[in-house]
A protein has these predicted regions:
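N-terminal capping segments
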Residues: 2-89, 180-198
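...with weaker cross-activation on analogous glycine-rich loops/strands in unrelated enzymes
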Residues: 26-31, 91-157
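Short, Lys/Arg-enriched charge-dense amphipathic segments
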Residues: 67-82, 113-133, 174-175
Length: 198
């Protein structure tokens, strides 16, 4: 049975679901988008005709064009995951938030990625077209960012993304003050690199 932990941000985190390398995240007090994202850790896309009702409910909660366009969890949903994290944390969404690279306009640009930042990445589709991926920074090693995101291996999880694919680093515009735990996090380079998040 999973162990539930109530964080200082009043979020329930399923601590037993986080891999050992990332269990230190359970003790982090924020930022809010990261805490919201951790609440969904392990959420899986359903294969075939059925859809995960949690994922499709996110689209309805965001509303507008997102609810009109997003009707199945087999549609790339990294932008939808980021939208639900941002909305529930109280932040305005970029235009057309389902498009990952549009998150390159969210918040404020940063020269160095730190805990809780929104990172966008370039990816190539099967046809060779340029597309994107968006996720939340939890750390880095020499060659990769470790990111919490949706539609990473068809679920919400933490994976390694090659630094060479980075498109933009964005930080939420904090209303009061930047949380004190915003920092670079150096991690071991274990696990394979993500190659395609579609």
């Amino acid at each position: 049975m999973p162990v539930l932990t109530l964080s200082s941000a009043s979020s329930i985190i399923l601590t037993s679901k986080l891999p050992r390398q990332y269990q230190w995240l359970d003790k982090e007090p924020g930022p809010k988008m990261l805490m919201e994202g951790l609440n969904h850790y392990g959420c899986l896309e359903h294969k075939g005709k059925g859809n995960n009702p949690d994922i499709t409910k996110w689209a309805k909660e965001i509303g507008g064009k997102v609810a009109e366009v997003y009707r199945a969890d087999e549609i790339p949903w990294c932008g939808l995951f980021m939208a639900i994290c941002a909305r529930r944390a109280g932040y305005a969404l970029p235009k057309d938030p389902l498009w990952a690279l549009n998150w390159g306009t969210f918040g404020t640009g940063q020269p160095v990625a730190m805990l809780g930042d929104v990172l966008t990445f370039i990816r190539k589709t099967a046809s060779g077209a340029t597309a994107g991926h968006v996720a939340i920074y939890v750390g880095e090693d020499d060659t990769a960012y470790h990111t919490l995101g949706g539609n990473q291996s068809d679920c919400v999880c933490i994976t390694r993304m090659a630094k060479s694919r980075l498109y933009a680093i964005r930080r939420p515009q904090f209303r009061i003050a930047q949380p004190k735990n915003i920092r670079r996090v150096h991690l071991a380079s274990s696990g394979k690199l993500s190659a395609n998040e579609a």
